[in-house]
Structures are given as C-alpha cells and as structure tokens.
C-alpha cells in the first residue's frame, strides 16, 4: 500500500502532513528510510511537497491547515476570521496566523502573515476551536487578538459579537487589556 493510501486510511480529514505525521503512519524512525519513502512518493506523484518537511496529496490542500502546520503552535485569527465572520468587509487574500514568531511567507502562491503574541496568550485554548484539523479563533478571540496587537480599531459590523465571551477572554487570556476593555465599553449594547 502506498504512503497516500496509508495516510488516508489512518487520517480521513487531514490534507497536510508533516514528516512526523508520515513517520507515525509508516512506523519508520530511520531518517534514511523515511527520506527514501518520501522521495519515491514524490517521484510517483503520490504526495506533493508544499514546503520543507510538509506534504499533501496534491495542490488542493487546505491552506489554513498548512498555515497551522508551517508554524506550531499557532491558530488562524485576525483578518482571516474577521472577514469570514463579516466583521470587516474589505477582502483579504492572505491568511493571518497567530504564533510565537512574526513572519511573512509566500508559499505555493498563498501569502501567510504570522503575528507574534506572548506564549501565555498563544497557549491558552479559550476561544480557539479545532475544525477539520485547523486551529481557528472564534470571532471574539480574533477581535481580542487584533485589539491586543494593534490597538483600538474600527470594525464594520459588531452585531454578532458574544460580549460575555469578549469579557471572559479579556479577563482570562489578555489580563484585562486596556484596548479590549475600551472596545467593550464603547461597542457593547
């Protein structure tokens, strides 16, 4: 059975795999053996190489899933979530990711913007959901991230905000950040 079929059999939802994922599925610990297996899989087009150490079945992989696996720990947030949730109306084609190191990367035709945040915030799971192998912020967490990183800002649509969650996030994750507190006091109805 080829690598791609073994990956599909074990993990039916993921579209992006690290070398570590592949080692686990194949039960190979030897570096030379995994290199040979990956080389064969790439030559026979079983797998597609996205970036060093990260692979998919083909070019139709989840860009958000890749964004999470390219830098770990991380979660999708900021304008990616705000646009999808209808809080900002301006279109953004880049994928915004919160992690422990700031960086811009253009990989396989997709721009990724990684923003650094303190570990105590990054590693707190409140307001982060896992959907189809992707760690993604809730609307409220994305707003808090934006306010925490960039200061007060105008958002086009604040109707669907769960204000109780905003208050809880500010208290438990962001240590009562002044910008988040001001935003809540101005916009909470």
Which residue stretches match the model-derived regions?
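Short beta-edge/loop segments at beta->alpha junctions of small alpha/beta modules
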Residues: 1-73
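Nucleic-acid-binding surface
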Residues: 56-189
């Amino acid at each position: 059975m080829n690598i791609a079929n073994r990956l599909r059999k074990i993990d039916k939802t993921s579209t992006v795999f690290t070398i570590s994922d592949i080692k686990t599925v194949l039960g190979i610990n030897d570096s030379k053996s995994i290199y040979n297996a990956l080389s064969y899989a790439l030559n026979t087009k079983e797998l597609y190489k996205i970036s060093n150490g990260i692979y998919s079945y083909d070019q139709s992989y989840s860009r958000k899933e890749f964004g999470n696996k390219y830098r770990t720990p991380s979660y999708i947030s900021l304008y990616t979530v705000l646009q999808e949730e209808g809080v900002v109306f301006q279109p953004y084609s880049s994928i915004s990711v919160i992690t422990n190191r700031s960086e811009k990367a253009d990989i396989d035709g997709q721009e990724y913007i990684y923003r650094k945040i303190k570990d105590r915030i990054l590693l707190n799971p409140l307001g982060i959901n896992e959907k189809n192998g992707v760690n993604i912020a809730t609307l409220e967490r994305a707003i808090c991230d934006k306010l925490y990183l960039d200061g007060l800002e105008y958002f086009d649509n604040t109707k669907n905000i769960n204000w109780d969650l905003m208050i809880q996030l500010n208290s438990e994750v962001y240590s009562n950040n002044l910008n988040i507190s001001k935003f809540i006091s101005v916009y909470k109805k």
